[in-house]
Amino acid sequence: MSKKLNRREFVRTTTAAGVAAAAAARPLFGQAPTMLTPKGVKPCVVASSNGNRSKDADGVTCVAKAFKMMTGGADVLDALVAGVAIVELDPSQTGVGWSGLPNADGVVQLDASCMHGPKKRAGAVAGIEGVRTPARVAQLVADETDHHLLVGKGAQDFARAMGFKIEEGLINETARKQWLEWKRRTDPLHYLNPKDRAQAWYDAGLQMVREGLIDGEHFWGTINCDGINARGEICGVTTTSGLAWKIPGRAGDSPILGAGLYVDGEVGAAGSTGRGESNLYNLSSFVIVEEMRRGAHPKDAAITALKRVARNTIEKRLLNTKGQPNFGLSFYCLNAKGEYAGVAMYQSTYAVCTENGPQTLQTDALYEGKATD
């Protein structure tokens, strides 16, 4: 015969069971809380242009996949990470993922970050080697640890512990050949002066871009992808192989919150591609979100950030004949209303997916002409 429970014992027993069941069903930091958001938000995914170029085996692009998953009920960040994985795994993308152009030693080191607006959680990895999809590792940093950023061997060890296959010497054959050509051009120019050496490395890479050996976009690489669903839940992710031929250990803006990516679930999201050092110095994604908080449209917020970057670019080596920045830098942003924009230092393109399907659109630009003018 079963023992009869009094009311106090019943409440204590059922409460404990409910808590245990709930804890077993969710990741370490829990599910996103229920949010009260304005009705009528139109779902949107906005990304750099490679978000509507690389395709999976079914011919689906990053923004299309993310939008379909998101509007089908998937968590927004899950959808975005699945979308950028298409680009990370594309062997023709030498600026993102395992096939990205390596560092000066011929080693591929990847960076990624993600932010979950409703959960107010973030995760990032920098300088991780031997992993094909760093954005997913960054997501697990957010979900399974109390940290926001893991770097180098520590990031790799964490990925291994999470079940990722670590591939030693992971490099795409095309990227390896391009690295060898860069080495051939720069070995005679290894000066004792670090500044001269760095400039020689950079100039050799840009010359390879001019000759068509490297796609200019892939020299800096990166994909940023941000999304908002019909409930107004906002997330973002940025992933990259970083600057081609970088000094080993260099981390740019992509894994740094506030630079390569920033999300405030009540305001909006912003992310970037282009010259990481210039973006990192100005924490531009944070600036954009704060401008949107003050009421600025995403386009105007991004223009404000670009003007700050231009104002703080004073080294002659970084200026063209017009006295303007001689590099590319682009921002992709959206606000809590579902308004979005792609804005660049110079004319470029970006990707977006709405109920009208995936599109590649022209960015708004701070300057006319080209960075090299």
Regions found by a protein language model. Name each.
Residues 1-5:
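N-terminal secretory signal peptides
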Residues 12-20, 31-373:
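Alpha/propeptide regions of enzymes that mature by internal proteolysis
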